[in-house]
Amino acid sequence: MDSTAQQFPLNHDLQVQKDQKGVVEEDEEQIHKRIRNYESHSGFSEYCTLFGHEKSVTCVSVSPNKRWIATSSSDGTIKIWSALTFRLECTLFGHYRGISQVKWATGSKYLASASDDKTIRIWDFEKRCSVRCLKGHTNYVSSIDFNPLGTLLVSGSWDETVRIWNLQDGTCLRMLPAHSEPIISVSISADGTLCATASYDGMARIWDVLSGQCLKTLVEPINVPLSNLQFTENRKYLLVSNLNSQIRLWDYRRNRVVRIFDSHVNTRYSMSWDCYSSKNIPKNTEALPNNDSSYPDDAESFMHDAYLLIPSEDGTIQITDPSTKIIIDDSIRHSDDPETSLLNVTSLGPFIITSGTDPYVRVWAPSLLLSKHEKDGFSP
């Protein structure tokens, strides 16, 4: 098996196929309407490429203060880049196998990394060194997340368990036998009270962080592995992606799906998405509304003034209006190599940052914005 658990395909004998019962069907006219680009927007252009990693870039994480970009790779390193100049600041060494994820803590001083060496490392960015190594998982650590205070960290692993760590002394407070297959993603709610987990067993679960009690189990309508999940900022919904090329917006309190995004390709990898301010792309008032009555009005506000950045394994990004599901832009293509899959997309002001199964990190900006500014004077 290759070195980064979160980013590599499942066993070849596990074939994921489309199941018509779990897919929202659309006629050809609806599809063409939904993928129509806004006429007032002229796409994105590559601003720069960040070189340095030797293998696939598994995660891109922007610091809360928007000053730094951390990238992790299956080459076992973390690189920190300036978000102002996009120049390499430092490289952090410590893991001896691939790194699946890197996350910043509140305050932008500390960050954590999850590795295939079965450990989690806490890094002091100011000192440029690892200050703690968390051991306990018995298989690849695939995902991590800090609570808002930066006092706790939750980790998910291929050993099918979730661990909750006290970062003051590095002790494991709880070990939860959470799933029957590898855990691919964990997410803590904005208020720090809930933790969500996604697994290859096709289930997402909601946990109480303090008690470790499972509060809710969300079951996909078809038996397909999950690939990622994330709480929305308003804490009301959970975005859950699966390897049937779908992202579902769950109202987990009512146990129902209120949105399905299914125009991208995701059948092999765990991929991350992000939000992108709608202020960076002019609105087209002629955009067609979504008249599908299966989507209730109470889901319209789950992303305020933002689009959803959805990566696709064909190398493109779909900038999608979450209210109408109209694809605003799909001009970004991470690589011309058909063998390279796009894995991660992250926003930084007007910039969009992409990484994939190649060793490059690419930075993109709206073409209209680039045409008005000299590159040397253009920054987030």
From Swiss-Prot:
Component of the Set1 complex composed of ash2, sdc1, set1, shg1, spp1, swd1, swd2 and swd3. The lineage of its organism: Eukaryota, Fungi, Dikarya, Ascomycota, Taphrinomycotina. GO terms for molecular function: histone binding; transcription corepressor activity. This is Set1 complex component swd3. It comes from Schizosaccharomyces pombe (strain 972 / ATCC 24843). Signal peptide: none annotated. The modification Phosphoserine is found at residue 379. It comes from the Eukaryota. Keywords: Nucleus, Phosphoprotein, Repeat, WD repeat. The Set1 complex specifically methylates 'Lys-4' of histone H3. GO terms for cellular component: chromatin; cytosol; nucleus; Set1C/COMPASS complex. Gene3D superfamilies: YVTN repeat-like/Quinoprotein amine dehydrogenase. GO terms for biological process: transcription initiation-coupled chromatin remodeling. PROSITE patterns: WD_REPEATS_1 (PS00678), WD_REPEATS_2 (PS50082), WD_REPEATS_REGION (PS50294).
